[in-house]
Amino acid sequence: MSRVCQVTGKSPITGNNVSHANNKTKRRFLPNLQTHRFWVENEKRFVKLRVSTKGMRIIDKVGIDKVLSDIRARGGKV
């Protein structure tokens, strides 16, 4: 399973660890992904999504129905 948010599309980015001596080594910054079940009232079932915490806030604000329709319009499987 890839580390990509199904709502926002956030994915890992690369950067550097920087030591006290200013030595730099490559690292990855991973998104804060959570697997969460959401109840979809009009389908009378739970939908399991892998979303970032920002994606959860978006679902709280606009609603799960709107988010699911956007995911399906992009061709995502839900």
Swiss-Prot record:
SUPFAM superfamilies from the UniProt entry: L28p-like
Annotated GO MF terms: structural constituent of ribosome
Keyword annotations: Ribonucleoprotein, Ribosomal protein
Stretches for region Disordered: 1-21
Keyword Ribonucleoprotein: yes
Keyword Ribosomal protein in annotation: yes
GO CC term, one of those recorded: cytosolic large ribosomal subunit
Compositional bias segments (type: Polar residues): 8-21
Gene Ontology biological-process entries: translation
InterPro entries: Ribosomal_bL28, Ribosomal_bL28/bL31-like_sf, Ribosomal_bL28_bact-type, Ribosomal_bL28_sf
A Pfam family recorded for this sequence: Ribosomal_L28
Protein family: Belongs to the bacterial ribosomal protein bL28 family.
Listed PANTHER family: 39S RIBOSOMAL PROTEIN L28, MITOCHONDRIAL (PTHR13528), LARGE RIBOSOMAL SUBUNIT PROTEIN BL28M (PTHR13528:SF2)
Protein name: Large ribosomal subunit protein bL28
Organism whose genome encodes this protein: Hahella chejuensis (strain KCTC 2396)
UniProt gene name: rpmB
